[in-house]
Every structure is written in C-alpha cells, then in structure tokens.
Amino acid sequence: IHKADTRGHSQYDWLDSYHTFSFDEYFDSDRINFGALRVLNDDKVAPGEGFQTHPHKNMEIISIPLKGHLQHGDSKKNSRIITVGEIQTMSAGTGIFHSEVNASPVEPVEFLQIWIMPRERNTHPVYKDFSIKELERPNELAVIVSPDGSTPASLLQDTWFSIGKVEAGKKLGYHLHQSHGGVYIFLIEGEIVVDGEVLKRRDGMGVYDTKSFELETLKDRKSTRLN
C-alpha cells in the first residue's frame, strides 16, 4: 500500500508534483516500479506553464486530465488540447520530443502522468488522444486502454487501464486479465476497502497472487486501475 502522504514530492514555482514511484530527486529503492508500471505522477501545473519540449524514448506514456486543459505538442507534428473526460497515450519508441503545458492563462491544470515500460523497444512513435466518456458506465469500471486493439488506444505492453465512478455502498468484483499479473489501484477521490484495507484520496495499492478480488466503496469515488 502506498499512502498518499508517503509519496515523493517535487515543488517548483510552476509545478506541484507527487510521485508514487521513484522520480526526479525522489528515490526509494522499495518504490521503483510495480511490474511494468514505472511512473505514476500526480501533477498540478500553474497557468501558462508546463513541461517544455523534452525527449522520451522506449516508454509508453499516458496522461489523464483531472482538472483544466492540457496542451500537447510533439516532433511528429501532433498538437492537441485535452481536458477532463479525455486521455492521451504516446508510444515513444525510437524517440520523440514533446511538450505538455497548461493551455489556460488563468487556471491550473491537474493531471496524472503514467509511464509503462514497453515489451518492444525501438518501435515507431505513435500518439493518440480520445474521449472516454462513451466508454464509462455508472458504477462500473470501464477498460479505456488495452494491448489488444479492443480500445481506442493500445499499449505495447500487456497492460489494461480501467477507470470508473462508483457510488457509496457499492461492491464491485474485479477479475485480472492475466492470472500471472497484478493490478495497481489508484484512488483519485473518495474512500474504498480492498481486501480489508481502506484506501483514501490519492492512495495506491498493488494486488497480486490472485485471480480476482472485491472492492467496496465507503464514499463516492473515482479510481484508475492498471492491470
């Protein structure tokens, strides 16, 4: 279990960032990764500021806006502004330069940035963004990213992303896509119980050595699952 207040923290004039796993100047030998999940950053960027053009190589990168508008630009001439209800994925492959900045001059942008280590290296860089609103269902977990082409965007790794909003007092069962894998749960808002453990806002938990498990919501919540 990774409690929210145990995460690494980087703070600059323009950025307030929490790191579930080792990143930037935060290093914990026990928190390098969870399977292929290498980075899970909870970022808040000041108006008009952001991550200027920088390179990535051989990494699957997913950005999920939680508030505000996030502007992406890259060396493959992709340019897009995404907001809540949309996500973007990028397979960096042989290499790509990109920027992510706050598109608003007056309001902060908050988003999750997630890095997944790919199973294939030096592939052709690919960018994709899309709406997840049509995929979401009340009190269900919707698969929004997968490796098998069943979702609008695919990753070069045996990884599934699920996201959902669930009312208080509901119970949900979850079956792993692969029996030898694991699931990482990140609670965006609310309070839930998983295997007797209570998770609160921005807590994370890895689940493995099981084929399925159940969660119960104590407060309305939105969570992201990485399987």
Please provide the spans of the model-predicted regions:
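A short glycine-rich, His/Asp/Glu-containing loop-to-beta-strand
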Residues: 9-55, 60, 111, 118, ...
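Tight coil/turn sites that cap or link beta-strands
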Residues: 42, 47-48, 67, 85, ...
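Glycine- and acidic-residue-biased ligand/ion/polar-headgroup-sensing regions
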Residues: 57-73, 84-87, 174-195, 201
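Short acidic-glycine-tyrosine-enriched beta hairpin
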Residues: 76-91, 136-137, 195-214
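Hydrophobic, well-structured mid-protein blocks that either form specific transmembrane helices
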Residues: 83-138
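Conserved small/polar residues in nucleotide/adenosyl-binding loops
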Residues: 220-227
